[in-house]
Curated annotation (Swiss-Prot):
HAMAP family noted in UniProt: UvrB
Matches recorded under SUPFAM superfamilies: C-terminal UvrC-binding domain of UvrB, P-loop containing nucleoside triphosphate hydrolases
Biological process terms in GO annotation: nucleotide-excision repair, DNA damage recognition; response to nitrosative stress; SOS response; symbiont-mediated perturbation of host innate immune response
Subcellular location: Cytoplasm
Domain notes: The beta-hairpin motif is involved in DNA binding.
Region of interest: Disordered: 635-654
Taxonomy, superkingdom: Bacteria
Keywords: ATP-binding, Cytoplasm, DNA damage, DNA excision, DNA repair, Excision nuclease, Nucleotide-binding, SOS response
Protein name per Swiss-Prot or TrEMBL: UvrABC system protein B
Organism: Mycobacterium tuberculosis (strain ATCC 25618 / H37Rv)
Role played: The UvrABC repair system catalyzes the recognition and processing of DNA lesions. A damage recognition complex composed of 2 UvrA and 2 UvrB subunits scans DNA for abnormalities. Upon binding of the UvrA(2)B(2) complex to a putative damaged site, the DNA wraps around one UvrB monomer. DNA wrap is dependent on ATP binding by UvrB and probably causes local melting of the DNA helix, facilitating insertion of UvrB beta-hairpin between the DNA strands. Then UvrB probes one DNA strand for the presence of a lesion.
């Protein structure tokens, strides 16, 4: 039976057109060598009971390492409903996506985060008369994953999307996205030239030389496309104006992967509109422009009026000619046909109305959701006031908390330390999950004096490194983390520094390298907390634990302590000269859970087992097409090469495929890495001159990865 008919708790949206969207059925099925254990069976049963009883909000208080992700997968299997899982940052979203993908291999588990590696928003500083133009660097792989998420949501029901707070930002309406998609069937009459025009209308570009994502090429009666959301290319073979065959094929080798009878090509951008809607939008923009110009001129703001007239007229002309312009999202209100002040369409509107929302690390994620709107609107008001944007640009924004709450149905909050909002929604009730399936208990907490703390820390690090274990060190400031990293390097310790400027996929890669043993110590500030799943870490060192504040609150300390809870010999060392209230609360809660876990183990004869977790991440999915690529002159895949993949039979030695056969770039000095980039650039240009474009593309990918490595070294102050 459909959930909507049994329980009226559904998500509402003025943009959702469910009756127009026919999604393929699909059955969620968990594939796992393990059955629920510890507190998991009781927690899954209780969550299912509460949700089926129609409770709108449910809290799962799950201690670190108790398998909240696995519990979520089993709950999804029980409920059989499309699910949005929200995580507080990209790193945790990547980790969650990978875990759910492993447990739900036959279903669509998608990843939806901001696609910017670098983003400088458009802004105007009135005090200094400084206009800052929007500048950004888009990660092509992450953009593909975003398109993959929206196309899956409009095509099937067995979908889980793992997203960051990016999911509450404006996106094109699902109806426009669907209406502008192109459905193709074998035997159907479709004029070839008409299809090419349709593809151009939805922002695909024709490129017969360089075949990349979001482009198509034409060879006689054959059209080949790489959709914006696919790793594979699509081949359409015509006989006259009739579609004779449809294939999925490898974009580089041309090898046919499978033949299909029908398929749908979704647009290359989420901001699309048909000719009629675009014409209507242009008229509305011109009307608003005239009103705003009259308003500015009546106030004597002639400079602002002229600036707005030039910028907007240019954008209008671009939209008329090519159906798109830079910054088109600022006109989304007109393109969507919305009224002033109304919220934009977001990823939430792509879900069916009976979807389930799971908020991971809710004590962090919930406040994030509520804070996005104010930061965005203050910047936009300045742009509008000084003639850089029309007032309607303010309606290209994230949702407010009230709008978000109105668009969601039933919600499960996951956290080891639930916040006040979640508990208030459930009247203080929660489902508890503190017993780990592996029998692991919470780590022992040791408080040490700050005098001689660095020497003590170095001794502890060396002990752990000798036992092939890892260490996390958390500091209060970026400067302290940088200085500590430099000092540890001077002392001959293999250490890296994780900070907010490291781009999305590189951040995941650093954590993966820590688990692989490429280095022993990871120093961070606020990134070494919620959800980081690192079983090899046996020691977490908290410097300045007695400095009260956001980073040393009881919730923060409990989360940080949890990073050592996945190792049999896990310990937490707090360096402090006094025990604060927050420290006492965190230590007491850890001891309470530890006592309960030990009692359960003794009663059931359980011997704690070390967690053996496969070392994999979202990178495996992002780059897996490289493994299927035919070996050209350089051999192997460039993108995997710079990541130092391990050779079979040599688990301790990181080696590279491709251009760097036998060389470990992660251990290269900075100067050598810079020389290598220069050398590869010359080889890339030579390959391009010789028309060896596939080889040149390999070099390009290598260079991009190495430059990211170089930026990371510069940021960490490595030589």
């Amino acid at each position: 039976m459909a959930f909507a008919t049994e329980h009226p708790v559904v998500a509402h949206s003025e943009y959702r057109a469910v009756e127009e969207i026919v999604r393929a059925g699909g059955h969620f099925e968990v594939v796992s060598p393990h059955a629920p254990a510890g507190d998991q069976p009781a927690a899954i049963d209780e969550l299912e009971r509460r949700i089926n009883a129609g409770e709108r909000d449910v809290v799962l208080l799950g201690a670190t390492g108790t398998g909240k992700s696995a519990t979520t997968a089993w709950l999804i299997e029980r409920l059989q409903r499309p699910t949005l899982v929200m995580a507080p940052n990209k790193t945790l979203a990547a980790q969650l996506a990978n875990e759910l993908r492993e447990m739900l291999p036959h279903n669509a588990v998608e990843y939806f985060v901001s696609y910017y590696d670098y983003y400088q928003p458009e802004a105007y500083i009135a005090q200094t008369d400084t206009y800052i133009e929007k500048d950004s660097s888009i990660n092509d792989d992450v953009e593909r994953l975003r398109h993959s998420a929206t196309s899956a949501l409009l095509s099937r029901r067995d979908v889980v999307v793992v997203a960051s707070v990016s999911c509450i930002y404006g996106l094109g309406t699902p109806q426009s996205y669907l209406d502008r998609s192109v459905e193709l069937k074998v035997g159907e009459e479709v004029p070839r030239d008409g299809l090419l025009r349709l593809l151009v209308d939805v922002q695909y570009t024709r490129n017969d030389m360089s075949f990349t994502r979001g482009s198509f090429r034409v060879r006689g009666d054959t059209v080949e496309i790489i959709p914006s959301y696919e790793e594979l290319a699509v081949r359409i073979e015509f006989f006259g104006d009739e579609i004779e065959a449809l294939y999925y094929l490898h974009p580089l080798t041309g090898e046919v992967i499978r033949q299909v009878d029908s398929l749908r090509i979704f647009p290359a951008t989420h901001y699309v509109a048909g000719p009629e809607r675009m014409a209507h939008a242009v008229s509305a923009i011109e009307e608003e422009l005239a009103e705003r110009l009259a308003e500015l001129e009546s106030q004597g703001k002639l400079l602002e009026a002229q600036r707005l007239r030039m910028r907007t007229n240019y954008d209008i002309e671009m939209m008329r000619q090519v159906g798109f312009c830079s910054g088109i999202e600022n006109y989304s209100r007109h393109i969507d046909g919305r009224g002033p002040g109304t919220p934009p369409a977001t990823l939430l509107d792509y879900f069916p109305e009976d979807f389930l929302l799971v908020i991971d690390e809710s004590h962090v994620t919930v406040p994030q959701i509520g804070g996005m709107y104010e930061g965005d609107i203050s910047r936009k008001r300045n742009l509008v006031e000084y003639g850089f944007r029309l007032p309607s640009a303010c309606d290209n924004r994230p949702l407010t908390w009230e709008e978000f709450a109105d668009r969601i149905g039933q919600t499960v909050y996951l956290s080891a330390t639930p916040g006040p909002y979640e508990l208030s929604q459930t009247g203080g009730e929660f489902v508890e999950q503190v017993i780990r399936p592996t029998g692991l208990v919470d780590p022992k907490v040791v408080v040490k004096p700050t005098k001689g703390q660095i020497d003590d820390l170095i001794g502890e690090i060396r002990t752990r490194a000798d036992a092939d274990q890892r260490v996390l060190v958390t500091t209060l400031t970026k400067k302290m983390a940088e200085d500590l990293t430099d000092y540890l390097l001077e002392m001959g310790i293999r250490v890296r520094y994780l900070h907010s400027e490291v781009d999305t996929l590189r951040r995941v890669e650093l954590l993966r390298q820590l688990r692989l043993g490429d280095y022993d110590v990871l120093v961070g500030i606020n990134l070494l907390r919620e959800g980081l799943d690192l079983p090899e870490v046996s020691l977490v060192a908290i410097l300045d634990a007695d400095k009260e504040g956001f980073l040393r609150s009881s919730r923060s300390l409990i989360q940080t302590i949890g990073r050592a809870a996945r190792n049999v010999s896990g310990e937490v060392h707090m360096y402090a000269d006094k025990i604060t209230d927050s420290m006492r609360e965190a230590i007491d809660e850890t001891e309470r859970r530890r006592a309960k876990q030990i009692a359960y183990n003794e009663a059931n004869g359980i011997d704690p087992q070390p967690l053996r977790k496969k070392i994999a991440d979202i990178l495996d999915q992002v780059y897996r097409e490289a493994d299927d690529t035919a070996v050209v002159e350089v051999g192997g895949s460039g993108r995997n090469a710079s990541r130092g993949r391990r050779a079979q039979g040599e688990p301790g030695r990181a080696v590279s495929a491709g251009v760097f056969e036998g060389r470990d770039t992660s251990a290269m000095p900075r100067a050598e890495l810079a020389d290598l980039i220069k050398d590869l650039t010359a080889q890339m240009m030579a390959a391009a001159r010789d028309l060896q474009f596939e080889l040149a593309a390999r070099f390009r990918d290598e260079i991009a990865d190495l430059k990211r490595e170089l930026r990371g070294m510069d940021a960490a102050g490595l030589k």
